[in-house]
Amino acid sequence: MNYLNQTVLFLVFFLLFGCAAKTPQYKGEMKDGNKHGTGTLTYPDGSEYIGEFKDDYKDGFGTYTFPNGNVYQGGFEEDLPNGKGELKYADGSIYTGNYLNGKKDGYGEYIELNGIHYKGNYRNDLREGKGVLVYPQGDRYEGDFKKDLPDGFGKIEYGDGSSFEGNFLNGMKNGYGIYNYSNGESFKGDFKNNKKHGYGTITYNDGTEFSGTFKDDILEGEGRYKLKDGK
């Protein structure tokens, strides 16, 4: 057999068997040449879908196993997770909730392996709208979210007993708020980037009040004391 014939045979073998090994393999019901009904679709990367098909798309209820070990079970529409579903991550984290076009969208609950627990609304895979976020150390935030961060009005209760209720921006205290310290004292006033910034009033345990202007948590200029009896 000459070199040219050997080359041709190799190319034919590669096209028939090499490419086939890189093509998803389907076993299941068909209609008009398309995947339709129930079946199993196995991909070369090890991922697999078992469930319902419609007009060649994953459509209906099914289970998709990712190459990294994550497993999604729930609704599909035109190949993408849609509607109610549950995503179990390989590390043990679990998301249960709504999907739209393959992304978390609508109400959902996400319990992470590290102990972070979120219940609330999502948009485009990010926390967006109203929600409750609880951290393993005991901190709890309830309020508005935007692009995965506290943004808008909310209240955070810390594990040490202190709390803050007011406005947030990009995950930090910004604008007017009330901070209640664990020792019983409180601050009412303006914040910027998690610090007292602007005019505010500190109320001490004995009822004495101190009002003044702050910058980066530090008093700027003079302030005014007001005793419990109003003097």
Each model region followed by its residue ranges:
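Bacterial N-terminal signal peptides that target proteins for export
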Residues: 1-8
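Intrinsically disordered/low-complexity terminal segments and short unstructured peptides
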Residues: 6, 22, 39-41, 62-64, ...
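Bacterial N-terminal signal peptides
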Residues: 8-16
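Conserved anchor residues at repeat-unit boundaries in beta-strand-based tandem repeats, strongest
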Residues: 25-36, 48-59, 71-82, 94-105, ...
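Polar, glycosylation-prone regions of secreted, cell-surface, and some intracellular proteins
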Residues: 31-34, 42, 48, 65, ...
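Extracellular beta-strand solenoid repeats
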Residues: 40, 63, 86, 109, ...
